[in-house]
Amino acid sequence: VAYVKAAEREEQIVAAAITEFSEKGVPGTTLRAVAGRAGIPLGTLHYVFPSKDQLLRAVIMAVIREISDALRAELEVDKGLEHALRHGVGSFWNKLVTSRVGLQIMQYELMTYSLRSDSDGGLAQLQYERYSALVTEFFERAAQAAGERCAVGFDTLGRIALAQVDGLILQYIAKPDLDRARRDLNHALDMLVLYADPQSVERTKPLNAETA
């Protein structure tokens, strides 16, 4: 049997888990099924991920990296916050929502699974804290690169943007309609742009400065 590096084996298992969870659902998927999907013995999976919770955490982090890549794809950060909102969120929707419905269902199942199985809902908190931090950092970087300020805190903007997109995803999952979803997403982005009200930051002269 060919030797596989630990990092590669972990990626292999996580990719198999995402596929299995997306197709079969989080609650009903066993570690044995994930091992079978990855083409490895169950003992190997247990060695890499001793518990299902550890595997789910790795899955969440992998999905976050994928979302980050989708947000940043072909994005020109110095074009400002409005561009980041419209282009970044639009790119995410096209790449990870309309063509990956199973992935979106999996993410909601991860949250509800955690809330049902963990007394403190730690996995659900991790999931949304990381999502919110990712979106917040994305917006803040875009504004700073373009020399803009935002009318509200970037953390607030990130949470509200996440809430709006989550709601639209749930509607799309329940009743897929590409045209309606795209219209609603554009309306939501219009509202977010108005709420953020990005403006260029201009250097102002000191009050005691005199004109020559």
Predicted features along the sequence, with ranges:
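Short, basic, alpha-helical segments at the C-terminal edge of helix-turn-helix-like DNA-binding modules
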Residues: 61-67
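Short loop-to-helix capping motifs
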Residues: 51, 113-118
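Conserved short hydrophobic patches within well-ordered secondary structure
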Residues: 42, 107-111
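Short alpha-helical functional segments enriched in proximate histidine and acidic residues
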Residues: 20, 66, 134, 138
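Hydrophobic/aromatic-rich alpha-helical bundle segments in the mid-to-C-terminal region
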Residues: 119-125, 142-212
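Hydrophobic alpha-helical connector segments
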Residues: 58, 72-104, 154-161
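Helix-turn-helix
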Residues: 9-12, 16-54, 58
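Amphipathic alpha-helical packing segments from all-alpha helical-bundle domains
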Residues: 98, 102-105, 118-144, 156
